Amino acid sequence: MDTTGRLHHRKHATPVEDRSPTTPKASDALPLPLYLTNAVFFTLFFSVAYYLLHRWRDKIRNSTPLHIVTLSEIVAIVSLIASFIYLLGFFGIDFVQSFIARASHDVWDLEDTDPNYLIDEDHRLVTCPPANISTKTTIIAAPTKLPTSEPLIAPLVSEEDEMIVNSVVDGKIPSYSLESKLGDCKRAAAIRREALQRMTRRSLEGLPVEGFDYESILGQCCEMPVGYVQIPVGIAGPLLLNGREYSVPMATTEGCLVASTNRGCKAIYLSGGATSVLLKDGMTRAPVVRFASATRAAELKFFLEDPDNFDTLAVVFNKSSRFARLQGIKCSIAGKNLYIRFSCSTGDAMGMNMVSKGVQNVLEFLQSDFSDMDVIGISGNFCSDKKPAAVNWIEGRGKSVVCEAIIKEEVVKKVLKTNVASLVELNMLKNLAGSAVAGALGGFNAHAGNIVSAIFIATGQDPAQNVESSHCITMMEAVNDGKDLHISVTMPSIEVGTVGGGTQLASQSACLNLLGVKGANKESPGSNSRLLAAIVAGSVLAGELSLMSAIAAGQLVKSHMKYNRSSKDMSKAAS
């Protein structure tokens, strides 16, 4: 038996059985299929109604009192009442209940044959039908405090595993050493998971542990795993970019984000596609060194920025990797401290490790001529990694990309449900002036971070680098005598790679393969990562176009008034 297979089974309190009788339904009137039952009662209702009206007309003509009825008329009246009660019970009550339940789920009635779209400021776009809402009341057992002497889940299969769990709980075996001691990553994760539950008295029942290759993350992706988190992946597209179509995978838990981006992709596709240009490709790392005086720090600055010394430094730097190629060095002084920003190409890797190795080589080389140099840190935040910084916004980091498209007037009206003038005005006041009022740094856009983070998670990028990768300025202007819309996004610091890190995981590798950028491009090193950056920019272009159109169309207030999503979520949580 699989050792970890039983780890999912917790010891539960005996549930309270719901023995309440099933509520009878109108459709139970006849032991027939529902559509036949409905047909019978529809026919009965209209036929007896016609018969009674015909009989009463004859009585009026013959001056016969209406209250005098024959046996056939009595049967007809009873049949009319019975069929009316059935139809009211089947359609009337169910209609009212479904109408109430549907009040916060209906999609907008757009004049398009494609799925309707609903977008709000949080980029939630409703396309799915409402989930069935059960009105049946169930009794839930009150949570009981777990005894400290029993495990939260069924005991492990082998006595050896039980002993290891107890040793981890008692602190005799470090949790981080399980993989090396056991030689089985999956078994180590299961034992660590059980030990964690016993130590914290908290269940991890909803966190899956089976179905994951723990060997693939050992020593490179995650330490001390106890399971993995599931995130749904949706597909937006096709995105027509530079003459090619791409189906864009987006991993997100934000409802309607994928559908919103999909609508933008549709508008771009119907307008002839988008075009992207790579402006720069270079990862950076900036160590901080200190001298006894600012004069000495300035001497190193002049040495590093002297073009005559670049080739020598490049040879030293490039020894770190066959893909690393030093592009430039920029320095900044703060007192007697010197910040040195190295920039280099990194092939298809995102390149943080690669550039760090090159920087280390150069620092060791400089020690011969600047022995008084004190290396404070390999990173001095002049890089700047995983934080908003003007240096990335101005100089760029990773891939710098600009992507543009011209959206036709009829597409703006039919697909986006707005007009060019409104979009241009909104972009000026919201993305440009509004962001300036807010003191934004690289945030001159509507929601670039939404699309960037969703693609990053799906393709195995570093989610934390969404901070600088989402730096974007969205521009819109009317062209072709004001009929069409020119839209562009300029993103100076998209940090992506197609090898290394999370890109080698099975799910993320599959998403990269879907885009045609899996792994390294042996014929043209770096082309896969550059293409991925272009796809990210194109997807951001689609997302910006769709959300801005929804805002320009004035649908935000309508969506919040009609679809009270927060109230719906609260009611679910309360139930």
Swiss-Prot record:
It holds the Pfam family HMG-CoA_red. It catalyses: (R)-mevalonate + 2 NADP(+) + CoA = (3S)-3-hydroxy-3-methylglutaryl-CoA + 2 NADPH + 2 H(+). GO terms for molecular function: hydroxymethylglutaryl-CoA reductase (NADPH) activity. Glycans are attached at N132, N318, N564. The gene is HMGR1. The lineage of its organism: Eukaryota, Viridiplantae, Streptophyta, Embryophyta, Tracheophyta. It is an enzyme of class 1 (oxidoreductase). This is 3-hydroxy-3-methylglutaryl-coenzyme A reductase 1. Pathway: Metabolic intermediate biosynthesis; (R)-mevalonate biosynthesis; (R)-mevalonate from acetyl-CoA: step 3/3.
